[in-house]
A protein has these predicted regions:
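Helix-loop boundary and gating motifs at the non-cytosolic
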Residues: 5-54, 209-212, 220-230, 234, ...
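Helix-to-loop junctions at the C-terminal end of transmembrane segments
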Residues: 60-72, 157, 255-267, 353
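Structural signature of the two symmetry-related core transmembrane helices
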Residues: 76-89, 270-284, 366
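Cytoplasmic helix-loop-helix junction between adjacent transmembrane helices
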Residues: 105-140
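Intracellular juxtamembrane helix-capping segments at the cytosolic ends
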Residues: 113-126, 308-322
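Symmetry-related core transmembrane helices of the 12-TM Major Facilitator Superfamily/SLC fold
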Residues: 164-180, 362-377
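C-terminal transmembrane helical hairpin of 12-TM major facilitator-type secondary transporters
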Residues: 269-311
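A late C-terminal transmembrane helix in Major Facilitator Superfamily
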Residues: 325-353
Length: 391
């Protein structure tokens, strides 16, 4: 019973802390962008500034497992909330753009640590029979914060120090909630003898999971950066082309929880294969977009939803197989493969649209989904052989 109470308390702390932190962060991001623009910084400069967040995430990802071993998951989680709060205070105390750049980079590293440790904690604390649904609910909540943060900024306004005060208050609430994590969460004093698992070790331990994460990142995150260009190429105006991003986000938010529920009841490997087959089929259907542009709306919804569902299935699978520092290690590599998919999709898709406007997009993403299916099936076959050999 004490273990169940501790797990429930851990879930409440992880959900509430992450909710307040991300609402604050997604309010802070457009606030900084608008403030820099008002101060005369050009679009390219603002773009480079924004990229510092992703650079911070990319750099901290391979270090997350080591940090969790050194500090323990509980204090790593707390640190990932405290650093953005300190950075937000720094934005108020100084106007120097180079200081803002440093602070935003550090905030990006903290958000990457929160992403990895937070999802690992949720997967670890969730009861096994409900793990898929709880992980899916957590990721749906994260998607909702993308919309709430900018919405709060619209209500508060962008002038003066008031919006920064609201951001600081939200981040402080997140830190306070993180302190509620139970002391039974692993500290830095136990399991430290377990060696850190590098990228190769994690890939060998769960290749099918990492393959699913990579394909999910391509279709959920990667396509987001390409959708406005795709919309313009099939005749949409600027507003409609931009709205495709919202539709993709809605698809992702809507399908993550059902995907988690399916993961609780059925074989997760088979679900991942079915999702990848559906991505392959929908990519083939995109060949009709030049003639029937209206198909973009359901297709984009499906791509965002299936990509997010693949990532959910992958995280649930890791939560079922690993615990403690080992889970943080594998979650970090899953985030790396997911992010890599998100990074590769926009430039590759842009090249395809430039050089073959009518069929290039379809050919590229059909090829990606097909290769993803082959990788997934091959990884599952190797894992089955390994399990048979171990038996």
């Amino acid at each position: 019973m004490p273990g169940a109470v501790s797990s429930t308390r851990g879930l409440v702390a992880a959900f509430s802390s992450t909710f307040f932190e991300l609402v604050g962060f997604f309010m802070l991001l457009p606030l900084l962008q608008l403030t820099l623009t008002a101060r005369g910084v050009g679009a390219s400069g603002v773009g480079l500034f924004t990229a510092l967040d992703w650079l911070g995430i990319f750099i901290v990802t391979p270090l997350a497992g080591r940090l969790a071993r050194f500090l323990g998951e509980r204090w790593s989680f707390w640190l990932s909330g405290a650093l953005p709060l300190v950075c937000a205070l720094g934005f108020v105390l100084t106007d120097a753009i180079w200081w803002w750049s440093v602070l935003f980079f550090v905030a990006g590293m903290a958000s990457g640590l929160r992403w990895i440790v937070g999802e690992a904690l949720v997967a670890q604390c969730a009861p096994e029979r409900y793990r898929g649904r709880i992980v899916g609910l957590f990721q749906t909540m994260i998607g909702v914060t993308f919309m709430i943060g900018p919405g709060v900024l619209v209500l508060v306004g962008t002038q003066g120090t008031q919006p920064f005060v609201v951001v600081i208050a939200l981040l402080a609430l997140g830190v306070a909630c993180s302190l509620a994590l139970p002391a039974t969460m692993r500290s830095a004093t136990d399991e430290d003898h377990v060696p850190h698992a590098g990228v190769r070790t994690a890939l060998r331990a769960a290749p099918s999971v990492m393959a699913a994460g990579f394909v999910g990142g391509l279709f959920e995150v990667g396509l987001t950066g390409l959708l406005p260009v795709l919309g313009l190429s099939i005749g949409f105006d600027n507003a409609a082309a931009t709205l495709l991003i919202t539709v993709s986000g809605i698809g992702s938010a809507v399908l993550m929880l059902p995907a988690g529920a399916l993961a609780d009841r059925f074989d997760r490997n088979r679900i991942a294969v079915v999702l990848t087959v559906l991505l392959l089929a929908s990519s083939l259907v995109s060949a009709a977009l030049p003639d029937w542009p209206w198909l973009a709306w359901p297709l984009v919804f499906v791509w965002g939803g299936l990509g997010g569902a693949l990532y959910t299935i992958a995280m649930v699978s890791l939560g079922m197989r690993f615990r403690g520092p080992a889970l943080v290690d594998r979650a970090a590599v899953l985030v790396m493969t997911y992010t890599l998919g998100g990074i590769l999709a926009p430039p590759l898709g842009g090249l395809a649209l430039d050089y073959a406007p009518r069929w290039g997009f379809t050919a590229l993403f059909t090829l990606i989904a097909g290769l993803g299916l082959v990788l997934l099936l091959g990884a599952l076959r190797r894992e089955a052989r390994g399990n048979a050999g171990a038996a």
